[in-house]
Swiss-Prot record:
Family: Belongs to the cytochrome P450 family.
Binding site for heme: C125
Single GO biological process annotation from the record: secondary metabolic process
Inactivation phenotype: Abolishes the production of ditryptophenaline but leads to the accumulation of cyclo-N-methylphenylalanyltryptophenyl.
Enzyme class, broadest EC rank: oxidoreductase
Cofactor dependency: heme
Pfam family, one: p450
Keywords noted in UniProt: Heme, Iron, Metal-binding, Monooxygenase, Oxidoreductase
Name of protein: Cytochrome P450 monooxygenase dtpC
Function: Cytochrome P450 monooxygenase; part of the gene cluster that mediates the biosynthesis of the dimeric diketopiperazine alkaloid ditryptophenaline. The nonribosomal peptide synthase dtpA accepts L-tryptophan and L-phenylalanine as its substrates and forms the phenylalanyl-tryptophanyl cyclic dipeptide product cyclophenylalanyltryptophenyl. The N-methyltransferase dtpB is responsible for the N-methylation of cyclophenylalanyltryptophenyl to yield cyclo-N-methylphenylalanyltryptophenyl.
Single GO molecular function: oxidoreductase activity, acting on paired donors, with incorporation or reduction of molecular oxygen
Listed EC numbers: 1.-.-.-
Species per Swiss-Prot/TrEMBL record: Aspergillus flavus (strain ATCC 200026 / FGSC A1120 / IAM 13836 / NRRL 3357 / JCM 12722 / SRRC 167)
Pathway(s) where this gene product acts: Alkaloid biosynthesis; Secondary metabolite biosynthesis
Length: 181
């Protein structure tokens, strides 16, 4: 994990949320995880998945030739200093309200010109809430069971690109051990 300083606070938040839910996993658990909400949105902002897909746009009266590639400038919007202060610095609590500590799921799943992670307009992903909650649940399950640390020589994982997609080098190694919760 590139930002291990978030592991302990997120684990604590998970433990408290589970306690409030009598240790039962449910959708309601996310009402008590504002740090996770902000952390998720910051991960999506900084590590924007992007790609290019062939498409014909008949609904707009325009037709792109089959095989024409296009993409939204999501990463450019997410790293624009006019949209986000200090955009190149990962801040897992960027989207938490400084006074209340709250972070609303609507900020993560509502498309806008500044937030393009799930597309925008009529083409926005209809399963964005489900995708977000599944990702968060999987993250919490791993976080609850394991301590993770990247095995790095220089402190930063190598990034590789395939077309317009960015990935951590698949040969990057991790140390994994059972968590002590």
């Amino acid at each position: 994990m590139k930002t291990p300083e978030y592991l302990a606070p997120l684990r604590e938040e998970l433990a408290a949320a589970l306690k409030q839910a009598d240790n039962a996993w449910s959708f309601d658990i996310f009402k008590h995880t504002p740090k996770l909400e902000s952390f998720t949105k910051e991960c999506l902002r900084v590590f924007t998945p992007s790609g290019k897909k062939p498409l014909q746009l008949r609904s707009t009266g325009r037709t792109l030739s089959p095989g024409t590639k296009f993409s939204l400038p999501a990463q450019q919007a997410h790293l624009d200093p006019d949209n986000y202060p200090n955009p190149n610095i990962f801040d897992g609590y960027r989207f938490c309200d400084p006074q209340s500590g709250a972070c609303d799921i609507r900020g993560t799943i509502t498309p806008s010109a500044k937030w393009l992670i799930f597309g925008i307009g009529t083409s926005a992903c209809p399963a964005r809430l489900l995708a977000t909650r599944i990702s968060q649940t999987l993250f919490f399950k791993v976080l609850r069971k394991y301590d993770l640390r990247l095995k790095l020589d220089n402190g930063q994982p190598e990034v590789v690109y395939a077309a317009t997609n960015m990935f951590v080098n698949f040969n990057t190694q991790m140390y994994v051990k059972s968590a002590s919760i």
